Amino acid sequence: MMSRTVRLVLLALACTVDLSQASGFTENGLSLLSYQLCSYPVTRSVQKLQAVQTSHTAYVYCGGWIPWKKCPKTVYRTQYLAMDVPESRNVTDCCAGFEQLGLYCVLSLNRSREFASRPGVCPTAEAEPLSPSCSLDTDCSGLQKCCSWPGGRHCVSPTPTGTEKSMVSWYNVTVLVKVGFEDLQREDPGLRNHTRLLYSLVTSALQPLNPAVHYLTSTGGKDTFTTVSWLLMGFPRLMTVANVSVMLDDMVNRVYEVVSIQVQDVNECLHSELQACSVREQCRNLEGSYQCVSSQRLNHTDEDCPPIRDFVALNVTSSSFHVSWSLNSTQNYNFHIQVYKGKEILRSAWTRGHTMAVSDLEAGVLYRVRTSYLGCGANVSATLVVKTDAQVFQVTIRIMDRNLTEQILDCSSGEFWNFSRQLFHEVQNSFPQAISDLYRQGRLRMQIVSLQAGSLVVTLRLTLQDPDFSVGVHTLTPMLPVLSVSNVFQVDQQRTFVQDWDECAHSSEHDCHPSARCINLEGSYTCQCLTARDASPSRAGRVCEGDMVIPTGDELSVTTKVTVPAASTGITTFGPETLTESLSSKHPRSTPARSQTWTPVPPSVRDGGSIVRQDRNSTGQGQTHGTHQGTTDAPLHTTRESQELITKDPPFLTATTTGYVVWHSSPTWKTPPNSTRLQNEDPRSSSFPGPPSAPTDVTPESPACVPGPIGKVTVSNVTSTSFSLEWPADIRLSPAFHLTLVSPRGPAMTMETQNNNVTLSGLEWGTLYLVEIVAKVCGKEGARTQLKVRTVAQKLAGNVRITSMQYSESFLNTSSREHREFVELFFRTVRDSLPATLRQHMDAGRIRVDIINITNGSIVVEFNLLMTADLDVREVSAGFLNALQNTSMLEVVRGKTFMQDYNECDMKEDDCAPGTCRNTFGSFTCSCDEGGPDSQVEYSGRSCDGDPSGNMTQTPGSEWSPTPAGTRGVPVPIASSTAQDLPLRLNLMDAVSVSCEIETVIITIQKRFLQQAAIPEASLYLGEPSCNVSRSNSTHVFLVAGWGECGTILQSNMTTTVVTTTLRNNLSPEGVIHHPQFLSPIHCAFQNDVLTSSGYTPQWGVYTVIEDLHGTGNFVTEMQLYIGDSPIPQNYSVSASDEIKIEVGLHRQKSSLKVVLTECWATPSSNAKDPVTFSFINNSCPVPNTYTSVIQNGHSSKAQFKLRIFSFINNSIVYLHCKLRVCMENPRNSCRISCNDFRSLRSSEALHQMTWGPLHRTEGAQACTKPVLGTGYIILLAAAALLVVAGATTLLILRYQRVRQKYNLRIQTDDFSYQVFSQ
C-alpha cells in the first residue's frame, strides 16, 4: 500500500514538472545543447477554471404545526466555468536569423549565400562550354564557384578578393557524423540541410572569432553508417591547429551525432584563391599561414645566413622573463618569436629588435621559446628552454578508507571530481595561517600528480609563487597533524609526509644546460657548469661553453669537447614547421622527445657488474585545483624503467697492430662517476643526445698548419656488435682524429687515432650510435663530421596485463626487493613457457627482453623484444605471444596481451639520413632522397650516388636472407619528394578496421598499407580463399563475410553472441614468399541482453582493432506500435479502450536468432529508469490486471503482444520500454520459454536504450478513469453468485422439511429386514 501511494505521489509531481526540460529538450523539440538558442517572452491564452456562485429560489417545508406548508428559500450554487486567461512565460527557441532543423538551430534556406558559398568571386571571363551546370557553389568540385552566364549557371574557378586575403589562417576541417551517406542522400537530396547544419554548428562553436567557413564535399565513411564531410575554414588572425581543435571539441560534446572533428593546416600556396603572392614572388607555406618571398631573394644563394647566437633568458621571475639574442649580420631581419607551453603556443610576435619580454606566465612552469628569421631562402631558428621561478614541494597522503578504482582514475568522472574537491578542501583547511593566506591570494597552486594503490596514495605538488617569507618543509609540516584528524578521510599518519620536490630528478623539471650539473635545493634548484666557462653568470648553469674533463678510472680517460650551445639551433628549408611537445609521459617508448635533455644518471650495478640502463620520463600535467586539464592516467607521475634480460658491460679501447682501434667488452671497466651525456641538436631525429650537427666555427689559419676537412665517411661491416668507419684525409700534417661515440644507454666515449679508419666492436645490438669525427693539428680543430650508425637487430614491442598479482608502488624503485623479485619471476616464467628452440636462442644470447615500464592495472608490463638478424621474427613473435598468453604461473588478460612491430622510423632509431626510413615488421629499410650524393656519409651497399635504377631491398626475416637485419641494400632514389612529404608508415592495427553488423562482418583495409607491405589485393581473403575482396575504391579494399559463410563460426551463450573468422593472405603459386604473410583472427562480440524503448536506435557496433582484430557490435532493435494492422507514429493519441499491438525485434531478420522479451514497462517520461513505472510484462509473462496478452515470444526475431495501456494507467502521456534477450536456436537449446522457468535479467548485463513516444490519451477521456472489471471477472462473479443462491435455497428447503416432518414411509421390495426413510 505504501509503495502504491509513493508511486502516485511521484506521478503527480512528474505531471507538474515540464517534462521537456527534464529530458534536455525544449517544448518545440530543440536540444538544450544546441547553439543559437534565445529566450523570448510569450503571452498566450490559457483556459483556467473559475468558481462562479449563482442563486435561485427553492420552496422547502416551513415546519411547524402545518407540516405540509412550503416557504421560499434562496439557494446558492457554485459552478466552474472555463475562461481564457492571458499568461506570460519565457519560451526557448532559435535566435533571430535561425530556424529549427530537427534538434538544432540552423540558418534558413534563403541564406544559402552564407552556408553554400566558396571563397572568391566570379570571374569576368565567360565559362568554358563544357563547364558543369550548377545551382549553388556546393554543387561544384574543389574551390570552384557557381556563376551565372547567359547560357545558365556553370562551375568556374573564382578570382580572389580582398575578403579572402584578409584571412590569415586557413585550415581543413574533417567532420565524421553518425549517418549513412546513402541514407543522407536519400533523405536530403543535394545535402542542403546537411550543409547548413554543419555551417551553423561550426560557426557557432567558433564564436566570437568570426571565421569564414566554406563547405567542400561529403562522402561515406569507413563503414556504411558514417559520413565524412570536409570544410574549409579561415580566420582573420593567426590560430594554431591545437587551439582550433580545442574549440571544436565543444561541438563534439554538444552534438551527439558528431563522432570526431579533425583540423589540418591548408597549403595556401596550392590555391590562388587563398593567397595573395604576386607573380614575381614565391609562396612558402607555414602552419596556418603562408609567406611571400621574392624570387630575387630566393636566387641569392651567396647571401650570408648567420646562426642566432647568445640566445639567453634574463630577468626571470615567477610570471615573466626577457629573452635576448644576437646575429652577426649587417642586414635588418624580422624575427618571429614563439613561446610554447608543451604543445600549446602561448605567444607569437614579430620584432626587428634582439630582445623580447614575455609576461603573464605561470610560476614553476617550463616554457620553450623559439626565435627564427628568414634568410638565404631558409628558416634559421634557435630554441631556448626557460623555467619560471617558484618554490615546489611534494605532499604524499595515504588515505586508508578509499581504494584506487577505475572511476577515480578517470579524470572526467564525477567520482574523481568529487574526490579531488574534497581532498583540496581538506588540504586547504590544514594549511598554517601564512600558507593559507598565500592560497587565498592565488599564489599557491595545488596539483594532483599521481594516484596509486595501497589503499589510495595521493601525491600532491604545491607550487608557491613569490612568498613574502622563507618557506621550507618545516613551514608545511604543521599541516600534517591537522590533516590526520580529517572528518572526511581516514589518513595514515605514518605514510603522510611533506618533502622537497626534486627538480633535478628529470630534465623536464629544470632548465639547466646539458653540460651543467643540476643541484637540488629545498624548494628549488640551481645549476653549475661543468665546463671551463659560464657564458651567462646571471643565470648560472644555463649557458656552458668550453672543454669539460671528466674524472676517470684506471682503464679509460674520457674527455669530451662540449660544443652544445645554450639553445639548440638549426637551419631548415621553407615548409610546414612541425613543433612537437617537449616531453610527454605518454610517449610509447623511453626515447626522448623534442628538446629533451638527459641528466647524468650513473648506471646501477647489479649481479656483479651487469649494467641496468635507467632513464626517467617526465610527468604529465596532473589535476590542478580549480582547473579542468585533460585526463590523468594512473600513475600520473610515472618513472619509466628499462631493464635488460641479457646485459653487457661497457666496452673499452685497445690499439691493434693494424692501426685499428677496437672496442672490447671488459667486466672490470668502470663508468666515470660524473659522466655527462650530450644533447642532440634536434632530439626528434635521434633516440639519444649528442653533439650539435652545426659545424664549429674555425678561425682562419695559414695554410701551413690548418686541419683539412673530413671527407665522406664510409660505414661498412655493420653487425649486431660492431661496425667499421673509413674516411679520406690529408695526412701530410699527420693529423690526429678525435672520435666521440654517444650511446643512448651510456656515457659519451672518446678516442684519438692517427689512422683514417677504425673498427668499433663490443657494442650493443639494435642500438643507434652517434659518431663525431674531427681532425686536430697544431692544436686546432677542423670541421666536425657527424653520422649515425645502428647495429643490426630485429625489434618488436610487447605488452602484457597480469591479473594474478597486485601492483605495488615499490615497483617504481628498481632497487627494491619487490621489483627485483617480480622481474625475476617474469623473466623465469616467460623463459620456461617458450618452446625449446626459442629457449635455446635466449640462453645463447640471441634473444633479449628489455622491460620498459611497469604500471598499474593490475600489473601492465611493457617490454621490447630484440633478436638477431638470422631469426624468423614472426616465429619469435608468435612463440612469445603464445608463451605469455598460456603461462601457468601468471594469469594474464589475453585481450591486453599482444606483440607488435616496433616502428624504428617513427621512434627515430634509424640511420637512414639523409635518406628516407620505411618501416618493416621487425626492422626497417632505407631509400635515398634527392640530394643524397652531397651527404657526408656513405653506407656500404646503399650509396646514394650509385645506379639510380637500383631497387630497395627488404630487411631480413624468414623471407630475406642476403643482408643482415638493420643493414640496407641498394636504395631507390626518390627525386620527387622529401622525407617531410612522405606519409607515415601504417601497421596492421592502423590500416584495418572491423565493422560488426548483424548477419555481416566487414573488413576495411587501406590500400596504402598493402602497397607499403607489397601485399597484392588478390591475395586477401576471409576464412576461405573464395571469400576474397568484395569491392574496392581508390583508397580502400573491402572484404565481407556473412554469418555462416567463409568459415565464419557463430557461438552464443546466455550473455554474448560471438562471430569469428580469420583474415589471411595466400602465397604465390610458385611457393616463393614475395610479401609478408599474416593470419589475423577476427572476433565480433554482441551483447544478448538489450533494453529497447520506443524511439531510440543505438549505434551500430565497431571498431576496436588490436593485434588480432577484435571488434564489438550491438544488436540494433526496433519497436513498432499498431492499432489493428496499421502502424501508428509517435505522439499518437489513443483511448483507454484501444488495444495496441506492439512488435519488438531486431533490425534485420535472422532465422537462427530469436528475440525473447523478459520485461516491459511504461513510464510517464522518456527515462527508462524513471522511479514511477507501470510494469505489464515480467519474467516474459503478462502482469495480471494490465490487459496484456502475449502473441509470440521466442519464436522468431520479432516478439509481439497486445495491451490496453490506458486501461490501467491514469497518466495522459506514457513511454514504453522493454528488455529483450537474443537467443540462438539449436537442437539442444530452445528459445521458447514458459512463464515459470525463465530467469530474470541480471542487473550487470549491458543494456541499450531508445525512446519511443509519447502516447497520448484521446482528448475528452477522463483524466482519472476508475479501474473496471474485465469480462472474465464479471462472468466468474455471476457464477459464484448463482452458486451461493442455489446453495442457500437448498439449505432452506432441507430445514423446512425437517421442521414440518414431511417424510415418505414405504416398504422396500428387496429382502431386507429394516425400513428405509427417503425424502
From Swiss-Prot:
<dbReference type="GO" id="GO:0097211">
    <property type="term" value="P:cellular response to gonadotropin-releasing hormone"/>
</dbReference>
<dbReference type="GO" id="GO:0042981">
    <property type="term" value="P:regulation of apoptotic process"/>
</dbReference>
<dbReference type="Pfam" id="PF23344">
    <property type="entry name" value="ZP-N"/>
</dbReference>
<feature type="domain" description="ZP">
    <location>
        <begin position="995"/>
        <end position="1238"/>
    </location>
</feature>
<feature type="compositionally biased region" description="Polar residues">
    <location>
        <begin position="950"/>
        <end position="961"/>
    </location>
</feature>
<keyword id="KW-0106">Calcium</keyword>
<dbReference type="InterPro" id="IPR048290">
    <property type="entry name" value="ZP_chr"/>
</dbReference>
<feature type="region of interest" description="Disordered">
    <location>
        <begin position="569"/>
        <end position="649"/>
    </location>
</feature>
<dbReference type="InterPro" id="IPR018097">
    <property type="entry name" value="EGF_Ca-bd_CS"/>
</dbReference>
<feature type="disulfide bond">
    <location>
        <begin position="512"/>
        <end position="527"/>
    </location>
</feature>
<feature type="glycosylation site" description="N-linked (GlcNAc...) asparagine">
    <location>
        <position position="243"/>
    </location>
</feature>
<dbReference type="InterPro" id="IPR000082">
    <property type="entry name" value="SEA_dom"/>
</dbReference>
<keyword id="KW-0245">EGF-like domain</keyword>
<feature type="disulfide bond">
    <location>
        <begin position="905"/>
        <end position="917"/>
    </location>
</feature>
<feature type="disulfide bond">
    <location>
        <begin position="94"/>
        <end position="105"/>
    </location>
</feature>
<dbReference type="InterPro" id="IPR013783">
    <property type="entry name" value="Ig-like_fold"/>
</dbReference>
<dbReference type="GO" id="GO:1904708">
    <property type="term" value="P:regulation of granulosa cell apoptotic process"/>
</dbReference>
<feature type="glycosylation site" description="N-linked (GlcNAc...) asparagine">
    <location>
        <position position="951"/>
    </location>
</feature>
<feature type="domain" description="WAP">
    <location>
        <begin position="115"/>
        <end position="159"/>
    </location>
</feature>
<feature type="region of interest" description="Disordered">
    <location>
        <begin position="664"/>
        <end position="703"/>
    </location>
</feature>
<feature type="disulfide bond">
    <location>
        <begin position="928"/>
        <end position="944"/>
    </location>
</feature>
<dbReference type="InterPro" id="IPR055355">
    <property type="entry name" value="ZP-C"/>
</dbReference>
<keyword id="KW-0732">Signal</keyword>
<keyword id="KW-1133">Transmembrane helix</keyword>
<feature type="glycosylation site" description="N-linked (GlcNAc...) asparagine">
    <location>
        <position position="90"/>
    </location>
</feature>
<dbReference type="Pfam" id="PF07645">
    <property type="entry name" value="EGF_CA"/>
</dbReference>
<feature type="disulfide bond">
    <location>
        <begin position="38"/>
        <end position="95"/>
    </location>
</feature>
<dbReference type="GO" id="GO:2000241">
    <property type="term" value="P:regulation of reproductive process"/>
</dbReference>
<feature type="domain" description="EGF-like 3; calcium-binding">
    <location>
        <begin position="901"/>
        <end position="945"/>
    </location>
</feature>
<dbReference type="InterPro" id="IPR003961">
    <property type="entry name" value="FN3_dom"/>
</dbReference>
<dbReference type="InterPro" id="IPR000152">
    <property type="entry name" value="EGF-type_Asp/Asn_hydroxyl_site"/>
</dbReference>
<dbReference type="GO" id="GO:0005509">
    <property type="term" value="F:calcium ion binding"/>
</dbReference>
<dbReference type="GO" id="GO:0005615">
    <property type="term" value="C:extracellular space"/>
</dbReference>
<dbReference type="InterPro" id="IPR011489">
    <property type="entry name" value="EMI_domain"/>
</dbReference>
<dbReference type="GO" id="GO:0060612">
    <property type="term" value="P:adipose tissue development"/>
</dbReference>
<keyword id="KW-0677">Repeat</keyword>
<dbReference type="InterPro" id="IPR001881">
    <property type="entry name" value="EGF-like_Ca-bd_dom"/>
</dbReference>
<feature type="region of interest" description="Disordered">
    <location>
        <begin position="939"/>
        <end position="966"/>
    </location>
</feature>
<keyword id="KW-0812">Transmembrane</keyword>
<feature type="disulfide bond">
    <location>
        <begin position="277"/>
        <end position="292"/>
    </location>
</feature>
<feature type="disulfide bond">
    <location>
        <begin position="504"/>
        <end position="518"/>
    </location>
</feature>
<feature type="compositionally biased region" description="Basic and acidic residues">
    <location>
        <begin position="638"/>
        <end position="647"/>
    </location>
</feature>
